[in-house]
Amino acid sequence: EGLRWHQKVNELEVGEDNSLANSVTLVGFESDLGVAFNKGRVGATAGPNAIRQALANLPWHWPNAALADLGNVTAKENLAQAQTQYADAICYALKQNDGLVIGLGGGHEIAWGSYQGVFNAKPESARIGIINFDAHFDLRKPSPNTSSGTPFRQVYDHCQLHDTPFHYACLGVSKAANTPALFNFANTSNTRYLTDVALNDESLCMQRIDELLSPMLKDIDELYVTVCLDAFPAAQAPGVSAPSALGISPTLVINTLHFLAQHQNTYGYQWRLCDVAEMNPNYDIDSRTAKLAARLIFEAVDAISSHT
């Protein structure tokens, strides 16, 4: 009962015939190409290993679960190629495993890879929903480069192509960090969202989240949750490309993760994939951001273990 994450982890390779039954599986995406294309502050390539370092000494509370690590996919020059390779690793982990798969970023371009991983792992008819904790919609149109600002526009285009509904919710969006054009596109694409200001009202925020998400959760088979670390106040998450002046509370996100794990049976969806994006150790102070990322991952694992 005295084990910590670093004592529990098995390093595995994609493609081996591993039994990952009841495992939590980590997959890193070393990329800041999308951040660079988005004209942001680079450094998120070192994010996955910084998060691992912060996870290493956390206690392991789930005696029946194993921990696997599939290592990192690195984006050197070709972002789309690296996203496909990372998507293959996510797809492999989801197919080999019935536990939670966790993507470690890397810039938020990780999200396009994560989505493709779920899409490829599931039957064509599976309805996928995305919940993004983020100060930004990330619904920009690729022009022509894709970036850390385009992943959910890419998902929207993919849904149009496959004639499937676009189920996307963004929690913590900042009016001061998204243009009117992005708000217009969010509205025409039926993006569900709550602003950072709306989520800073502690007495009402969980009720608002329930009202926003429940209709979507009823309509999906698979849930993918992505946390962009710039959703949090700069004092708590300085190690990101675009620090937030306001941000939302980590406790709110943790409560929502537990809400999402709990409602799987109520609404009949599965939550199997979570990623954490925009970890940039170059700008971190006292590993604050890495420790926050690790705590959120710990809580996602705890939420799913408690409600499965």
Briefly describe each language-model feature range:
Residues 1-28, 33-308:
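Conserved alpha-helical scaffold segments that buttress catalytic/binding sites
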